[in-house]
Amino acid sequence: MLSRVSAERSLMLLPPLHRVPLRLGNVVEIAGPSPSAKTQILIQAAVYCILPKEWRGVHYGGLEHLVMFIDLDCRFDILCLSQSLKHRLMETSGSGNKVNWEQNDDPWGSGTEEPNIGYDEELFAACMRRFLYIRCYDSFEFLATLKTLRYRLQRARETHGVTAHFLMIDSIGAFYWVDRASTSLHLESNSRKRLSLQSISETVVEEIRKLLLVHPMLVLATKATILGDTYSTNEVKRTSMKLSSNDPSNLRTVTGGPQKLSYREFMPLVWQSFVTHRILVRAADDDPANSKYQSRSIFLSEWLMPSLNFSDKFIVRDAGVFVVS
């Protein structure tokens, strides 16, 4: 019963995922062109999850749970995670107070220097052990990983004494174009049985759905988008064409003032229907030279599902992602 109550409780995530209440079992798609800080958003959420709530009298405000990170585009840099974690530990150790996940008077500053304060290496090692990483090089490895993930998570739970709260999939569409170009994928070299693009997507969704029944987690999946025209700086509102079950590649339109941006939804309908929440992130068209964040790229986030009538601007620093408007 306690596990069921925990699964139903909302998770208070960090920006830009803070606008919508999320629960274990939700599937959040973080879509956007490259670069748009999608992986940085995952890293910040991962640090929040693996940090303890409290350690030796210091409040860190974390969840103290495991993160399962599946890297599909094979470009994840573990050093970025460790540096972000170290920065958070030093920042908190220096303040001695509760971590402020929201805006401070000037949390962004103008440089990239880290606080001149040490951090607890024992705590750092404990947090890093709660980050579970798997790299897949093709759809076959991805499917094999999903089919065995239930047992991996069970062993991890027995080892660490805590459950996994986040299942992160970096670049869910990484193998889409390769699989689409191939007529089929062999399950075994001596087998006639083949996997089609549609069956791959169906199996992925089915395996994740079965996994969530046994190990309730919040799924955070990034996805690269194919964009058309540029946005305007005005508030972004989304309209979309009716999904066609016969054509998995649906043209979506995002409007901003008089300008429109089209992007193609290339993922199969079975995945689109599986997603419960979707947020679009992109580089803002602000001129950095005219802002106080001259050394930082400014990004824009917009919730498409559920649709919200406003958007957030944010920047990425060593300490994480911060909303600037």
Residue ranges, per PLM feature:
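Intrinsically disordered, low-complexity domain-flanking/linker segments in eukaryotic proteins
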Residues: 56-60, 91-120, 232-259
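The Walker A/P-loop phosphate-binding site
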Residues: 1-103, 110-116
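Eukaryotic short linear interaction motifs
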Residues: 37-38, 76-78, 140-143, 174-177, ...
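Conserved inter-motif catalytic segment of the P-loop NTP-binding fold
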Residues: 63-188
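Helical mechanochemical/support elements of P-loop NTPase systems and associated helical scaffolds
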Residues: 26, 38, 77, 127, ...
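Intrinsically disordered, low-complexity regulatory regions enriched in Ser/Pro/Gly/Thr
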Residues: 22, 59-63, 74, 124-126, ...
